[in-house]
Curated annotation (Swiss-Prot):
GO terms for biological process: protein refolding. One of its GO terms (molecular function) is isomerase activity. It holds the Pfam family Cpn60_TCP1. Belongs to the chaperonin (HSP60) family. It comes from Paraburkholderia phymatum (strain DSM 17167 / CIP 108236 / LMG 21445 / STM815) (Burkholderia phymatum). Together with its co-chaperonin GroES, plays an essential role in assisting protein folding. The GroEL-GroES system forms a nano-cage that allows encapsulation of the non-native substrate proteins and provides a physical environment optimized to promote and accelerate protein folding. The lineage of its organism: Bacteria, Pseudomonadati, Pseudomonadota, Betaproteobacteria, Burkholderiales. This is Chaperonin GroEL. It is an enzyme of class 5 (isomerase). It catalyses: ATP + H2O + a folded polypeptide = ADP + phosphate + an unfolded polypeptide.
Amino acid sequence: MAAKDVVFGDSARAKMVEGVNILANAVKVTLGPKGRNVVLERSFGGPTVTKDGVSVAKEIELKDKLQNMGAQMVKEVASKTSDNAGDGTTTATVLAQSIVREGMKYVASGMNPMDLKRGIDKAVAAAIEELRKISKPCTTNKEIAQVGAISANSDTSIGDRIAEAMDKVGKEGVITVEDGKSLQDELDVVEGMQFDRGYLSPYFINNPDKQVAVLDNPFVLLHDKKVSNIRDLLPVLEQVAKAGRPLLIIAEDVEGEALATLVVNNIRGILKTVAVKAPGFGDRRKAMLEDIAILTGGQVIAEETGLTLEKATLQELGQAKRIEVGKENTTIIDGAGEAANIEARVKQVRTQIEEATSDYDREKLQERVAKLAGGVAVIKVGAATEVEMKEKKARVEDALHATRAAVEEGIVAGGGVALIRARSAISGVKGDNADQDAGIKIVLRAMEEPLRQIVTNGGEEASVVVAAVAGGTGNYGYNAATGEYGDLVEAGVVDPTKVTRTALQNAASVAGLLLTTDAAVCELPKEDAPMPGGMPGGMGGMGMDM
């Protein structure tokens, strides 16, 4: 085990605060509509230019071990805020730096760090309660577009695209972001349920121009096992043929004789069929088959439910208005399932989301909800160069998270104004002693900092603007993009309540930990072993004639 260096008290804190300042100073220049760019070096390819706070924070690793500890703690503030709310990383970093800076002054003057932390926690709890009170629901397309635009660094086209996508697939729908092929942003919407499995044979294609198989008003057969013997399928195929409608077979696999017979029947026009593999694996496959069954009003033919292929009837088959099967995707449009059953299933999956422990499980469950509830929208980001594409894509993803947060918890006035207004609730909070009162003062000062930084980045005098905004009421604030004062909500300068709340909570949490740190343990740098001595000189010819 490597030797460790242990540093105590002020020496440890001072070094860690240096690290906090290095990271925060690099991140905070990106805040607000007039935020500056930061250029990030890449190990290969050109550098990346960004105005995204969390992207800057993630790149920073410091040489000094103690400074790096401080920087990593604030990096945690940024990434936690990004994970929970999708935006607000720069605001959280600015708040954390301010709480640490002000707190260190009080610690240096001999105050008890634990009482300071208790005071900070009391003030933050009161501020969050006030933020919830002043929050208003975000329901209209215009409000959603405004939130998206602000989060994407005042890019209105991104806000409009996200609002349009949410309008098409609903608030719960899946919206994904991909690289586009042109200079313009594009929006593709897939209605109905889509899963990533295509036809098992190209002979099922009946629309050669688009290379897809289209089934109008088909039956849907769902089976959780492999189908290789055509005799198992014959009874149900005969019933479908009599009904004169096409059939989609979704099974673990369809192979051999069964697949060959289906292809021949399809080519001869006897029975229009398409076979695809079931999506997912293991338990997830069973769950997704059940989802499709509920969506189409059918049943999964499985031994567990006492159903077999040979005895299957049309009653067990699902139905849909239209199904499109491509090489890699199958889309079920307008399934015949009952709305009440679909709603109950969505509720059930949402409960599983709340109980899920891993991000991967949660993401997959959310996809299932979206597929059941509405559809999938794909925003294709257009840009002239790859560097611009990366930067823009990161902004679109941020904006998307922010709009989801706004729909979830509502919106407040942006531009740092909500935090200024929430200070009124803290003014009435009293600590149990003078040290706790000092902790409350720390938060009061920190809550001005985001507005100060936005104004500073815009090249104006921060103290004058903060005084003017603090003298106003409600949504009155300073619009840094135009340099004017007014109602920020009317001007479209809004922040999701969840983003502001999460930023404040996470900043106070990590800053409190730093203030109450009294020792730091880090590895000593390894000393390189000296190089071994060189080989002795040669023995020469020893006077021998050759």
